């Protein structure tokens, strides 16, 4: 059901953007089945749709991941999250500033955006003390500062925009995501709804 809700808008917008140049007579190639295939399967309808493909890749893994989705496996999920942080967030810094490490060493289970699935599940199902939550929030603030100032420093040094700290699984962005997930879990929504109408928040 989750995949279907995502697939429908993806197909709609992909087809719309694929047909658009032909309707406006701006197409640089004739309409063809190959063109339609490339638009849908090679992200040639509109480059901003890249995130759909990442979501679909994660969705295809969920039936397997669901086998581990049990609170008795929290320690295992914590281990996977640590692996994800080390290989997705720390290793790129080691490669850049210390010494190259072969990328094939990265465990397949934490490649791409899959780490967000494990991290989200862990935060949802584990209870964190106030001290632990403060540490998570502080790491998120640190990540935001690192993304801004770190990107400025490495970009200035390289003479062009450097995305080392801007990648979604970078050492800057992953802690920010954890902080947002944690805040969403522990925020007192009922108090917020008293101040701001619920319909505006959900919108």
Where would I find each of the regions flagged by the language model?
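Alpha-helical transmembrane segments and terminal signal-anchor/GPI-anchor hydrophobic tails
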Residues: 130-202
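Juxtamembrane loop-transmembrane helix junctions in multi-pass integral membrane proteins
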Residues: 2, 72, 103-106, 163, ...
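Hydrophobic alpha-helical segments with transmembrane-like composition
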Residues: 17, 21-25, 30-128
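Membrane-interfacial loop-to-transmembrane alpha-helix junctions, especially the N-terminal start
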Residues: 1-2, 6, 73-81, 131-140, ...
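Hydrophobic alpha-helical elements at and bordering transmembrane segments
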Residues: 3, 41, 200-203
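Divalent metal-coordination and catalytic microenvironments
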Residues: 3, 55, 180
């Amino acid at each position: 059901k989750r995949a279907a809700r995502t697939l429908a808008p993806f197909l709609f917008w992909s087809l719309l953007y694929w047909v658009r140049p032909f309707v406006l007579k701006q197409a640089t190639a004739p309409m063809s089945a190959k063109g339609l295939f490339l638009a849908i399967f090679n992200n040639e309808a509109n480059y901003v749709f890249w995130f759909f493909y990442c979501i679909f890749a994660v969705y295809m893994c969920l039936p397997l991941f669901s086998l581990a989705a049990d609170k008795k496996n929290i320690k295992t999920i914590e281990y996977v999250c640590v692996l994800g942080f080390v290989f997705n967030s720390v290793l790129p810094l080691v490669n850049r500033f210390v010494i190259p490490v072969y990328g094939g060493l990265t465990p397949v289970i934490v490649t791409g955006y899959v780490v967000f699935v494990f991290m989200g599940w862990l935060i949802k199902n584990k209870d964190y003390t106030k001290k632990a939550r403060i540490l998570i929030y502080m790491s998120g603030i640190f990540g935001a500062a690192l993304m801004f100032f770190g990107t400025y420093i490495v970009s200035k040094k390289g003479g062009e925009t450097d995305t080392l700290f801007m990648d979604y699984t970078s050492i800057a962005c992953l802690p920010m995501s954890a902080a947002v997930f944690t805040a969403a879990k522990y925020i007192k929504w009922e108090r917020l709804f008293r101040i701001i109408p619920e319909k505006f928040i959900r919108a």
